[in-house]
Curated annotation (Swiss-Prot):
SMART domains listed in its UniProt record: HATPase_c, HisKA, PAC, REC
Catalytic activity: ATP + protein L-histidine = ADP + protein N-phospho-L-histidine
Domain PAC: 237-289
Disordered: annotated span: 739-819, 1052-1109
Comp. bias regions, Basic and acidic residues: 767-782
SUPFAM superfamilies, A to Z: ATPase domain of HSP90 chaperone/DNA topoisomerase II/histidine kinase, beta-sandwich domain of Sec23/24, CheY-like, Homodimeric domain of signal transducing histidine kinase, PYP-like sensor domain (PAS domain)
Modification 4-aspartylphosphate, positions: 977
Residues modified to Phosphohistidine: 327
Entry protein name: Hybrid signal transduction histidine kinase F
The protein's Enzyme Commission number: 2.7.13.3
Main function: Acts as a receptor histidine kinase for a signal transduction pathway. This protein undergoes an ATP-dependent autophosphorylation at a conserved histidine residue in the kinase core, and a phosphoryl group is then transferred to a conserved aspartate residue in the receiver domain.
UniProt keyword Signal, yes or no: no
GN (gene name): dhkF
Pfam families: HATPase_c, HisKA, Response_reg
Length: 1109
């Protein structure tokens, strides 16, 4: 018993000592490690030693139901924290010998080789379970090693430390929040002394030390007052005051005051929160200002809404006005154009009358074109323009446009070319008229802004979907280019690249705008792909169409297999268009060798041929040692030579090249000449080579192909081309002797036939039903409807004009009649009557060529012999002369006619001077007048008006030219247009006035400004620029006459005085020499002198017609 008691007491003592030591160690840990994190780590190490476990730790339950260890250690070191889950959660002390029964994290079990698990729950002061003290062992753990009270102590101490850590974390967060707040806090006593300062902004906002009074920061007593109120009323109070810091800086502040008590309701102090409200006050002021602005904006928006409604109404009225006025303008224009065309085509006019009528007609067509543009634009703006969807020949339409643009290029060295892909569809459904309008606008724009170089149209299909296709048309030119600053406004209506008063290029500025809008209506667009000033521009037009059938350009062109492995030479001095021509001819020559050569190579070839002709036989040309660039001319596969003549090249030289090629190759290859429309009329009527107008069309390609089929034999036994030519030479030498004999016999007959010349009259207003037409051949499937629209020099569109055909007694061998465009022939018309054409006999050598009208209004046709037939002699003032026929016997008659007409004209002139009812436009002393205007039509009109009034004038095209002419000739009266390129009227006027002052002119020139635009103050502006007057175009005849008389009156009066003195002297001399009227010459001289000065007529210019222009 005693031994048992002793043993129990020993065990108790040992347990007590162990427990005391454990508690002491625990207390030491708590006091040494103030950081909760270190406390939890040391506690985990202690638990490992006490329970002899492998690992121990502190875990916390998170909101997702998982446990996160905040400390985890082995008996020797700290380990990495981890998360785990339990299969079931027990809030009591629990022990498991098999850890897999409760623990889910297999990776931790394997990593540390754990077998047993024990958990001691942790609860806060409110008995809320929040985590565990966990023990892991690699063997069985003894849960009874510690007393329950000790475990309770440990858990409570751990829970307290955890809450301490939680509060500490919250305090850190609160401090951070207070530091980030733009306010500061302090705790003061009831008398206002600072006890504690809080917040990072404290020093900046208050800067007071502990013990100082809070009232020292304000001059007013606002804070003191509310402190007293808080002490007595125990309420939350706030006020706004101005705080002055120690450094004297002031700022508006909001002060919040509240008394703070402990848990026993004992006052700890008064909390004061100070917040800088400078930004708030500023923001408040800004809000007030913004509110005022908002009210103003609302008012403005209301005004803008009203203005928008007015603008929409005005736009609608404007569109309606444009449509109405354009229609009303078109109605009288239709009459002017129609009657002008009738006047040109049916009336016998002399040169001056024809020029006037043609000017009226051309200007009317130009006005019609501008009016149509305005009407189209107004329709597009009003969304009233509708497309006409019809089937049309797309290829023919494009090539017709190309010919039309080619006709409009008259005086510029521009090469125009079309390049179409062979998969371009033949027939489409769309609006051909709008396609033509777009392409003509784009093409004429390119022509207008290109002075030299090229304009190339490329047509390709960019997409196909079922029966729809999108076609791209690119227009590449070498014009002036477009700057970056102009591109944003390029497609705006009425926009000009150069809108200054000195602009060089005219136009309404609607072309691109209308084209862009029409393209959008047709499912496409117009874009500027690239442009560089001084280099050129590239525009592209994409349009959508519906395709009909599967025919393309490739299917329409003839089979080209016959030309396989053949050679074609193209002569073109312009490399850019030469490459385009090469690609086009490649469309009809399959697997052919197309060689591009320049004029220098052709010269070398003919020099070589000429050298061998002089020194020997052409057959002896050594091809082995020949210059490589000349070898293609002797290639046996050569089938075609195409010669392209450029505008600036000498046409005669290129015609000689063509003729020499034909002569050398003996017509065994195709020789063709490509030429522009302007030079086409200068070609000989009788020719044995193929010719086509540029740009190259599909019809041109077909002609070359067909001629190649006819000329080129299917097989040839000759090894080279020289042998073939030699064989032909031998055959021709045998025939030449026979021809010489025949020519001798024909010479005698020819002399007789030349004496039997006849006159035939072809009336320009003859009935169109009597015209003979030559049926066209070989049309078939190649009939492209590509007749060009006639574009006259004013750039307006017109229908094709009738033609005058000259016929000889027998038709030519070619079966074709010579044709002249009626409009072109009419421009050269100089007669008052019908056309008189000299008809020759049917010999080729004597066929009429180069028929021209003699520019002399007083030459009458010769009297025909008895054996000549006169069909009509109505045109008494016109004579046709053939360059191939000389009529020596008619010269005497012509001289007699001249004398007789001169006599008649003299009598008519005297009669007109003595007539009181006619306009006083007799010959007089002509004042020196200069007209400066950049518009050719304006120059022509004013010059004709002055001529009608009896005055002559010189003309200049810009201000610099006018200034130079004035320096040279010192004109008395200058009509100066205000808007001109290079130098406008105002600058030219200042130059003239400066020149007059520097050179001390005794009298200065009278300068009258001209403009088609009248603005208020225009006359004052002209006077300020040194001019004497200003008038608005168009000028009426009578006001113009009065204006000229006004500024030339002083000079004319001086001339009149001189004339009167001369007349008196003549009269006195006549009276002295004769006492009677026996000398009629003296009387006539006297009368002539008295009537020679038109200004003596008091009714001068009073009866001038007011509607001359």
């Amino acid at each position: 018993m005693i031994l048992k008691f002793i043993i129990q007491q020993c065990v108790f003592k040992v347990a007590k000592i162990f427990s005391d030591n454990l508690i002491q160690i625990f207390m030491d840990i708590s006091s040494v490690y103030s950081s909760s994190t270190l406390f939890f780590s040391k506690l985990s190490l202690l638990m490992c030693k006490v329970f002899n476990s492998k690992c121990a730790g502190i875990s916390v339950l998170n909101k997702d139901g998982l446990f996160d260890t905040i400390a985890f250690c082995s008996s020797t070191q700290e380990l990495e924290n981890f998360s785990y889950s339990l299969k079931k959660i027990s809030k009591n002390i629990t022990y498991y010998d098999n850890i897999n029964e409760i623990f889910n994290n297999s990776e931790i079990i394997k990593k540390y080789n754990l077998k047993s698990y024990m958990e001691i729950p942790l609860k806060d002061s409110k008995e809320f379970y929040f985590g565990d003290i966990v023990l892991f062992g690699d063997q069985t753990l003894n849960p009874n090693i510690l007393d329950t009270n000790i475990l309770t102590f440990i858990t409570n101490r751990t829970s307290m430390e955890f809450e301490k850590k939680k509060v500490s974390d919250q305090l850190i967060i609160a401090k951070n929040l207070l530091d980030q707040s733009p306010s500061c806090s302090c705790l003061v006593s009831r008398n206002g002394k600072i006890i504690r300062k809080i917040g990072a902004f404290y020093e900046r906002l208050l800067g007071l030390e502990i013990g100082e009074n809070i009232s020292s920061v304000e001059k007013s007593s606002d804070i003191s007052t509310i402190l007293k109120q808080v002490c007595f009323e125990n309420n939350n109070l706030s006020t706004e005051t101005t705080i002055t810091k120690k450094n004297g800086e002031k700022y508006p502040a909001e002060v919040f005051v509240k008394e703070i008590s402990d848990i026993h309701s004992n006052s700890i102090g008064i909390m004061i929160i100070v917040r800088d409200i400078t930004d708030q006050i500023r923001l408040k002021e800004m809000n007030i200002e913004l509110q005022k602005k908002s009210e103003l904006e609302q008012k403005r928006n209301q005004e803008l809404m009203e203005a928008r409604d007015l603008a929409l109404t005005a736009t609608k009225i404007k569109s309606q006005f444009l449509a109405t006025i354009s229609h009303e303008i078109r109605t009288p224009l239709n009459g002017i154009i129609t009657m002008g065309e009738m006047l040109l085509s049916t009336s016998p006019l002399n040169t001056e009358q024809h020029d006037i009528a043609e000017t009226i007609f051309g200007s009317s067509e130009l006005l019609l074109s501008i009016t149509s543009d305005i009407l189209d634009f107004s329709k597009i703006e009003a969304s009233k323009l509708e497309l006409e969807m019809i089937e049309f020949d797309f290829i023919g339409c494009l090539e017709g446009i190309g010919k039309t643009i080619g006709v409009s290029i008259t005086n510029k060295p521009i090469e125009i070319a079309f390049l179409m892909d062979t998969d371009i569809p033949h027939r489409l459904i769309g609006d051909p008229n709008r396609l033509i309008q777009i392409m003509l606008n784009m093409g004429t724009n390119a022509v207008k802004y290109t002075d030299r170089g090229h304009i190339v149209f490329r047509i390709s299909v960019i997409s196909r979907e079922q029966n729809r296709c999108k076609i791209k048309i690119s227009i590449d030119d070498s014009g002036i280019g477009i700057g970056e600053d102009q591109r944003a406004h390029l497609f705006e209506p009425f926009h000009q690249i150069d809108s200054s008063s000195t602009r060089k290029y005219g136009g309404s500025g609607l072309g691109l705008a209308i084209s862009s809008k029409l393209a959008k209506l047709m499912g496409g667009e117009v874009i500027l792909e690239r442009s560089k000033p001084g280099v050129g521009s590239l525009f592209s037009v994409t349009l959508n169409f519906e395709q009909i059938g599967s025919n393309t350009l490739k299917s329409l062109l003839p089979d080209k297999s016959f030309s396989r492995n053949k050679t074609c030479i193209i002569l073109d001095n312009y490399e850019y268009t030469a490459s385009i021509a090469s690609q086009r001819f490649d469309q009809i020559f399959e697997e052919s060798n197309i060689i591009l050569v320049k004029e220098s190579t052709v010269k070398k070839f003919f020099e070589l041929v000429q050298e061998y002709k002089i020194n020997g036989d052409v057959n002896k040309i050594d091809l082995k040692n020949l210059d490589p660039e000349l070898l293609p001319f002797f290639d046996s596969s050569l089938i075609c030579i195409i010669v392209f003549h450029r505008f600036m090249d000498n046409l005669d030289i290129f015609l000689k090249y063509v003729k020499d090629f034909i002569e050398f190759y003996k017509k065994k290859i195709v020789v063709a000449l490509g030429i522009n429309h302007k030079n086409f009329k200068n070609l000989p009527k009788r020719r044995d080579f193929l010719i086509f107008k540029k740009p190259i069309s599909s019809t041109n390609l077909i002609k070359v192909s067909n001629m190649a089929r006819k000329i080129i034999p299917k097989s040839s036994s000759s090894s080279n081309l020289i042998q073939t030519i030699s064989q032909i030479d031998n055959q021709q030498q045998q025939q030449q002797q026979q021809l010489q004999q025949q020519e001798q016999e024909q010479q005698h007959q020819q002399q007789q036939l030349q004496q039997e010349q006849q006159f035939v009259t072809i009336s320009p207003h003859s009935d169109s039903s009597e015209k003979k037409t030559t049926p066209k051949k070989d049309r078939g499937k190649y009939d492209f409807n590509i007749s060009p629209l006639r574009i006259d020099r004013f750039g307006t569109e017109s229908t094709s004009s009738p033609k005058i055909k000259l016929y000889s007694d027998t038709s030519s061998d070619s079966g074709e009649s010579d044709e002249f465009e009626f409009s072109e022939n009419l421009r050269e018309l100089k007669s008052d009557g019908e056309l008189v054409v000299l008809k020759n006999q049917p010999y080729k050598e004597q066929r009429l060529s180069n028929i021209q009208l003699i520019n002399d209004p007083i030459v009458t046709p010769p009297t025909p012999k008895a054996n000549s037939e006169v069909v009509s002699t109505k045109a008494e003032s016109t004579f046709f002369q053939s360059s191939s026929i000389t009529i020596k016997e008619t010269r005497s008659d012509s001289v007699n006619s001249v004398n007789s007409v001169n006599s008649v004209n003299s009598v008519n002139s005297l009669n007109s001077e003595n007539s009181n009812n006619s306009l006083d436009v007799g010959i007089r002393t002509r004042p020196r007048i200069l007209l400066v205007d950049d518009n050719a039509v304006n120059r022509k009109v004013v010059k004709l008006q002055l001529k009608k009034l009896g005055y002559d004038c010189d003309t200049a095209t810009n201000g610099f030219e006018g200034f130079e002419m004035q320096k040279k000739d010192n004109y008395e009266l200058i009509f100066m247009d205000l808007n001109m390129p290079l130098c406008d009227g105002s600058m030219a006027s200042k130059l003239i006035r400066s020149h007059e002052e520097l050179n001390n002119y005794k009298s200065r020139a009278n300068i009258v400004g001209l403009s088609a635009t009248y603005l208020h103050g225009s006359k004052d502006y002209c006077v300020s620029m040194g001019m004497d007057d200003f008038v608005v175009k168009p000028l009426k005849l009578q006001p113009l006459g009065e204006l000229v008389k006004k500024y030339l009156e002083v000079e004319n009066n001086n001339n009149n005085n001189n004339n009167n003195n001369n007349n008196n002297n003549n009269n006195n001399s006549n009276n002295n020499n004769s006492n009677s009227n026996s000398n009629p010459n003296s009387n006539s001289n006297s009368n002539s002198n008295s009537n020679s000065n038109p200004n003596q007529n008091p009714n001068y210019c009073n009866n001038l017609p007011t509607d001359f222009i």
